[in-house]
Amino acid sequence: MCRTIATFPNTCLERAKEFKTRLGIFLHKSELSSDTGGNGKFEWASKLSKERSFSEDVLGWRESFQSLLNSKNGVAAFHAFLKTEFSEENLEFWLACEEFKKIRSATKLASRAHHIFDEYIRSEAPKEVNIDHETRELTKTNLQAATTSCFDVAQGKTRTLMEKDSYPRFLKSPAYRDLAAQASATSASGSSPAEPSHT
């Protein structure tokens, strides 16, 4: 993270530029994917509708953390931001838990539970999330009879941490504020948003 900006100003600046670039590329891809369609008037109307929908989506991210998590684009933008803070493991764990809950096979459930534990929960895990010792031990105990709810406590604590800590910083980030300003202008005028900066 950029806590020691006086000591490492270039590193923080580079991470901020990287986030802005990633978000710009992400937005450019979103615009390209919305360009497919029919000819003439219908294509223009369809594109305008998608741009308004995307603008509403972007503006909706600031309404609540749940709104951000409910948006595929929001999750992608938030993930890009978290990478600049070296804390993407929190969101990746939360997403892994959401996918885990969809597993119906008991064999796959147990196997996937151990994989998630080894990847995010155990001490010194490659992507260890910031949870307390009691939650870590409870989750370890839950693995003995893995169910779709065995990560619920750890997932809840990670979600709360992101909501109270990372999410407010995401909303205050220059990249999101620029994006929200473009989205507001698009919603107000009904015109196409400006091409995002890739610098």
From Swiss-Prot:
Tissue: Predominantly found in the retina. Some expression has been found in the liver.
Superkingdom of the source species: Eukaryota
Pfam families: RGS
Cell location: Membrane
Keyword Membrane on entry: yes
One GO CC annotation: cytoplasm
Gene3D superfamilies per record: 1.10.196.10, Regulator of G-protein Signalling 4, domain 2
Keyword line: GTPase activation, Lipoprotein, Membrane, Palmitate, Phosphoprotein, Signal transduction inhibitor
TM regions (residue ranges): none
UniProt key word Phosphoprotein: yes
A GO biological-process term: G protein-coupled receptor signaling pathway
Membrane topology: Lipid-anchor
CDD domains per record: RGS_RGS16 (cd08710)
Domain RGS: 64-180
PTM-bearing positions, type Phosphotyrosine: 167, 176
InterPro entries membership: RGS, RGS_sf, RGS_subdom1/3, RGS_subdomain_2
Gene Ontology terms for molecular function: GTPase activator activity
Known role: Regulates G protein-coupled receptor signaling cascades. Inhibits signal transduction by increasing the GTPase activity of G protein alpha subunits, thereby driving them into their inactive GDP-bound form. Plays an important role in the phototransduction cascade by regulating the lifetime and effective concentration of activated transducin alpha. May regulate extra and intracellular mitogenic signals.
Subunit structure, as described in the record: Interacts with GNAI1 and GNAQ. Interacts with GNAI3, GNAI3 and GNAO1.
Annotated protein name in UniProt: Regulator of G-protein signaling 16
Source lineage: Eukaryota, Metazoa, Chordata, Craniata, Vertebrata
